[in-house]
């Protein structure tokens, strides 16, 4: 009997993985993926490069970027592979969120939301838009997964509650994100010079949001010590390395709070006088915190959040043949516009 061909072996391996995946036995299936979303120019690429030990300068992310990393857990063992995705453009490209998050990748997927602490007026809208868009898509994928494997879907929903202990006093008051979520506040070196009261509001607000979604929260900057902490957290998501149990809730220091270790009691109420809380009409705790935050940091108009640069003119994406053809077509278009304008003017004169 002839030996199996490489193609037959590969086909059998794919079918084997599919059969294991449909069983939904709760095992860690496949290679892990980490999706970085967040503020435009917030430092997402820098964090990824640091986690992968790549000594290269960060370039602006145009749309959706992909890279991967490998790590060996032990001697003579195959390297684990992790996939890193990054969404550029802040909140301007929300439709691209659906590309990397699929039924096949969902169970090994994590989200890292990077927020620029130096721009507090953009912070809430960036966070809200990205988390809502991501959660909406993930919920749809979970429903789709449930149609093929109800057990796998149920295990996913059970797993999202695993970050909160069963006896946690806030268990009935929070709504964990459907997949692991880490919120990183970047540019702490600028943030630490803010007015203490402003720092207090931002810290308490982010602590509430992170706790409500069952997420980890940490601040970082160019400091090597902080970057090493962040690297450890990302490695845990990407390669399953032991999770840190350290915690720092002092608003005068970089926050570092692992999911499930905070509480509403420790966070306290929104930083607003009790007499004003009744005036803020809110239908949920999240809405109340938003109103309090927006009062101190009014969101900028949508127009100021949009990218003003034209990526087609960015020199790092130059393609001589394409650019020459683009110039030619632009000239032809201008010529057509002028010709059309003259034609319409002539028609108006004749009439």
Curated annotation (Swiss-Prot):
What spans are recorded as compositionally biased (Basic and acidic residues)?
A: 323-335
Q: Where in the cell is it found?
A: Cytoplasm; Cell projection, Cilium; Cytoplasm, Cytoskeleton, Cilium basal body; Cytoplasm, Cytoskeleton, Cilium axoneme
The cross-references to InterPro entries, in alphabetical order and at most eight, read: DYNC2LI1, Dynein_light_int_chain, P-loop_NTPase
Q: Null-mutant phenotype, please?
A: Death before 11.5 dpc with defects in notochord and floor plate formation and a reduction of definitive endoderm. Mice also display anterior truncations of the forebrain, defects in the ventral body wall, in closure of the neural tube, and either an arrest of embryonic turning and heart looping or a randomization in their direction.
Q: Does the keyword Cytoplasm apply?
A: yes
Question: Chief localization class?
Answer: cytoplasm
Which portions of the sequence form the region Disordered?
A: 303-335
Tissues expressed in: Specifically expressed by ciliated cells in brain, lung, spleen, testis and kidney (at protein level). Enriched in the ependymal layer lining the lateral ventricles (at protein level).
Fetch the SUPFAM superfamilies from UniProt.
P-loop containing nucleoside triphosphate hydrolases
Entry's Gene Ontology BP terms:
cilium assembly; determination of left/right symmetry; intraciliary retrograde transport; intraciliary transport involved in cilium assembly; regulation of cilium assembly
UniProt keyword annotations, A-Z: Cell projection, Cilium, Cilium biogenesis/degradation, Cytoplasm, Cytoskeleton, Developmental protein, Dynein, Microtubule, Motor protein
According to the UniProt entry, its GO molecular function terms are: dynein heavy chain binding
What would be one Gene Ontology cellular-component term for the protein? cytoplasm
Concerning its family, UniProt says:
Belongs to the dynein light intermediate chain family.
Subunit comment for this entry?
Answer: Light intermediate chain of the cytoplasmic dynein complex 2, a multisubunit complex composed at least of eleven different proteins. The cytoplasmic dynein 2 complex consists of two catalytic heavy chains (HCs) and a number of non-catalytic subunits presented by intermediate chains (ICs), light intermediate chains (LICs) and light chains (LCs).
Q: What does this protein do?
A: Acts as one of several non-catalytic accessory components of the cytoplasmic dynein 2 complex (dynein-2 complex), a motor protein complex that drives the movement of cargos along microtubules within cilia and flagella in concert with the intraflagellar transport (IFT) system, facilitating the assembly of these organelles. Involved in the regulation of ciliary length.
Q: What is this protein called?
A: Cytoplasmic dynein 2 light intermediate chain 1
Species classification = Eukaryota, Metazoa, Chordata, Craniata, Vertebrata
Name of encoding gene = Dync2li1
